């Protein structure tokens, strides 16, 4: 990792301004070994709060291949508390507008806006390069102009670089988002179906055990309307389920299809004989 910038960020109003200090931005690429010349390129910036944004609703062009994703570190407890609190809201991002502290600072290739957001326990930062959007807008404008003036240019001979640029920047992101959404939907659907099936099997086992217990009680001449018999029924059912707890776990995990009827019948008979032998 390599340190690329130090920021001082202003929050609050003009009359009640507060500055977050020691906001360090680090690049996480593997090519982070610095030589003596690179160490001098770390710049200092001052910034101001702009707005909160929903990370999920950011335009696709913001996180394309040309955007630099950084990690934020700090030694300031105040700065740490600020980001921990403000980024505690799910999917929230914080936008800051930043400018160099010195006029001589090399600002080429740097973005004017930084979006801070939380990814698990790490605060990450995306540098927003507005020139990308301006370039895309210009290219779209050129395409619309060409389509609206077919006499000035052949629509079939549109500049291939325009299409290639838009496709490479947008289609790859769109395909990735669609694919991820499909995978998440399939995973949720599969999980719900699996849960429904396991619950259904568990209910079937409980129903079978209940019927076996009631049949066993009738064979012993015990009336199901008496409170003592009902208590015996509940105790036997709980004990039967406990006896087959490992089988029920295997059912829920899908490792076995069903518990053999004979095994459940034997369990119920054994328990009823045990509970009624002194009756």
UniProtKB/Swiss-Prot annotation:
The keyword RNA-binding does not apply. One of its GO terms (biological process) is regulation of DNA-templated DNA replication initiation. It is found in: Nucleus; Cytoplasm, Cytoskeleton, Spindle pole. GO terms for cellular component: chromosome, centromeric region; cytoplasm; DNA replication preinitiation complex; spindle pole. Transmembrane segments: none annotated. Coiled coil: none annotated. Its main location: nucleus. Keywords: Cell cycle, Cytoplasm, Cytoskeleton, DNA replication, Nucleus. Belongs to the SLD7 family. Required for the proper initiation of DNA replication. Required for mitochondrial morphology. This is Mitochondrial morphogenesis protein SLD7. It comes from Candida glabrata (strain ATCC 2001 / BCRC 20586 / JCM 3761 / NBRC 0622 / NRRL Y-65 / CBS 138).
